[in-house]
Amino acid sequence: AKVLSSSINHGGKTNGYTVPNPVAQGALISETLRKAKVPAESISYVEAHGTGTALGDPIEISGLVRGFKYNVTEICPIGSVKSNIGHLEAASGIAALIKVVLMLKNKKLVPSIHSETLNENLNLSETPFYIQHKYEDWIPTYKLTEGRKTYYPRRAGISSFGAGGSNSHVIIEEYSEQPEVDIKFDSEHEFAFVFSAENKEYLYKYLNKTLIWINKQLKDTYNEETIVL
């Protein structure tokens, strides 16, 4: 998987030490999307912090709605690994990341178990989100251009929040293999190699050793070694 962007912020002053700030959470998500340079509608799964608390979860949903600014007609599954393995405290963020990376690798959405009975204050019917309750193929979102569907890569947003108001959000994307490009070199072209060293003395020594190696090994042929350099 590829990390497209990540951001952190803090909720600032709230009604209590453990009370989240939906405005700060929404601003964080918007900033992470901006840094990733991807549209909100391209996110086809959200891994929520989702501690299962009566107050925190509705506030997080409010922050997600603020951050993604979806139309209500757009649907995006959400889940939380905490419903499956519990709250790992300091390791909860990396657990969420590992979960989503494995989902991207296998192109599957996995259920958040023990979540059949939802907090009534979530009001998910008034949002573009729904809880992922079953194991199924991960279908990416798409955009319509002159009636034609163009699918986005599978992308996910991952939230992880601290008890004292610290917030983090990461956007990751599935890895797509790129076709290998056969690069051919010849002696008629010039190529620029970049070298660095601690100081000029070491730089000149390094350049001299490299030049000797090139003359011995490459002769007049440019090959894979040239690409490495």
What is the predicted role of each segment?
Residues 219-229:
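Charge-dense polyanion-binding interfaces
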Residues 196:
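Short hydrophobic/aromatic beta-strand micro-patches
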Residues 1-186, 191, 202, 207, ...:
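Condensing-enzyme catalytic core of the thiolase-fold
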